[in-house]
Design a protein with these regions (language model features):
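N-terminal transmembrane-helix/juxtamembrane module of multi-pass inner/ER membrane proteins
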Residues: 1-69, 110-124
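Membrane-embedded catalytic cores of phosphoryl/pyrophosphoryl-handling enzymes
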Residues: 2-3, 122-225
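Alpha-helical transmembrane segments of multi-pass membrane proteins, especially transporters
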Residues: 44, 93-98, 190-194
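Aromatic-anchored segments of alpha-helical transmembrane domains
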Residues: 22-25, 99-104, 170-180
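Hydrophobic alpha-helical transmembrane segments of integral membrane proteins
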Residues: 91-121, 181-186
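Membrane-helix interface segments
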Residues: 53-54, 86-91, 117-118, 157-163, ...
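Hydrophobic alpha-helical transmembrane segments
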Residues: 64-86, 144-146, 150
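Interfacial segments of alpha-helical transmembrane regions
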Residues: 10, 14, 75-103
Length: 225
């Protein structure tokens, strides 16, 4: 019971830290702070021309942050785990994460209306959908929950847990770097997306820890995915 309490507390603290980072980035964006200057400099980089095959790879790797793909993968795993262990828990958590992501990130995009860097002008309330990045928030929340469920409903394995953590980290970083290379998002969009996605992930895991379930084989340790 004490381990569970510490786990919930740890996830809530991390959610608060991630949300604080998102708020700070948002303030910077709203007031054209130092981060927006970095945004402008990165947007002006000369991107190299890639051969068709390399451009195809980059384009498709960017889909790792696509809402439809990530949702399909997560729900497929959730349904499989639900049928195997006769529980609605994976599906309910997945549905909660997708609803939270679309509600929070979607409303934020509409509220800020930030233009994309490809327009070569950074404007708010201009009908844009750039901030925060849906690709970045999708990557860390949806793939994070995918990894969490895969580890939770499997036999205890430190290797599997570490592999899940590193996999989600690599995918999230890859999505950020590809977005910067393709100039589809400002850096602050991406950092904001990662932070709000992480905050939602930690909150959902905390909810899962608070509401007990008898169908779980393995609950990852406090500092797991």
């Amino acid at each position: 019971m004490e381990v569970l309490r510490r786990s919930v507390s740890w996830h809530i603290r991390n959610a608060a830290v991630a949300m604080a980072i998102f708020i700070l980035i948002t303030i910077d964006v709203l007031h054209s702070g130092p981060l927006t200057e970095i945004d402008a400099n990165i947007a002006l980089w000369n991107r190299p021309e890639l051969p068709d095959w390399a451009d195809w790879i980059i384009y498709n790797l960017d889909h790792l942050g696509l809402r439809g793909l990530t949702a399909l993968c997560l729900l497929t795993l959730a349904i499989y785990l639900g049928r195997r262990f006769k529980t609605w828990r994976p599906f309910n958590l997945s549905l909660l994460s997708l609803l939270a992501l679309n509600l929070v990130v979607g409303l934020a995009k509409l509220e800020f209306g930030r233009t994309k860097p490809k327009l070569q002008i950074d404007l708010l309330d201009a009908g844009g959908m750039s901030y925060p990045s849906g690709h970045a928030s999708n990557a860390i929340l949806t793939w994070g929950l995918f990894a969490y469920l895969a580890v939770k409903y499997s036999a205890p394995s430190k290797f599997r847990t570490n592999l899940a953590i590193w996999s989600v980290s690599v995918v999230s970083i890859l999505v950020v770097l590809i977005s910067l290379f393709r100039n589809t998002h400002w850096l602050s969009d991406l950092v904001g997306g990662v932070s709000i996605g992480a905050a939602l992930f930690f909150l959902i895991v905390a909810i899962d820890r608070v509401i007990s379930s008898s169908r779980t084989i393995n609950t990852p340790q406090v500092h797991s995915v």
